[in-house]
Amino acid sequence: MPSSMVINTNIASLNSQKFLSRTNDSLHASMERLSSGLRVNSAKDDAAGLAIADRMTSQIRGMTVAMRNANDGISMAQTAEAGMGTVTETLQRMRDLAVQAANFAAVSGSDRDKLNAEFKQLGLELGRIIRNTEFNGKKILNGSLVGANFQVGPNTASDNQISVTVSDLAKVQSLSALFGTKLSIGGGTNSVSVRLAISAIDTAIGKVDIFRSNLGAIQNRFVTTIANLQSSVENQSAARSRIIDADFAAETANLSRSQILQQAGTAMLAQANQANQGVLRLLQ
């Protein structure tokens, strides 16, 4: 049945307006995505995708902060190990003095007193190092660092933390004997006393080496944790990108298509609006 010629309702114009509105929406969406670089700019673009991407963002940012925390752990362990390294160097110097003092055949009592003066000062310095070595205001060699938890994951689970304890060097008996010092290599001592000093120093060096090994193991654990976090951040970022980032090739094609449809729709709307002009000719 042929269409009637009416003037109150222009169906062709209404259809053209409807499709032109859709084209404009698509054009604006493509322009927004290309300008922002995001496929999902608001919940209306992809509500489920936005929710998933937000959860991934929380995990990615949490893991990024966790990497910084793990690096803090490495820095703390390095500081503690450096302090222990100084302790070891001091002990080695004290051992040199004791071995020299043990040479009773060539070293006089007054010479041993001079050696002992340095020996005692070094013993006092050992105590000062242990009492005052700190990281970010926290003492780390005097037993204060017990069960220090480093947050190395994005969540609250206990396995997202690494607990670090640094032994109290002051409680190591052989070290304590050197503070002040209870051992002596001076002129009033005999060879037995000097040998005891050497033995105590050797024991102390061995124990400090054990503590340093433990700190090295802690550092390696932090390094492994950081490597795992880096891989997780990379993979989660890639997954998030697939959900939320714009595909520039596809969006450029959509933009071109929408621009052509907009031009065509505008032309067709103009023609549809002119169609009713034929009614005027009938009335002439």
Identify the meaning behind each predicted range.
Residues 1-284:
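Primary detection of the long, small/polar-rich alpha-helical "axial" segments characteristic
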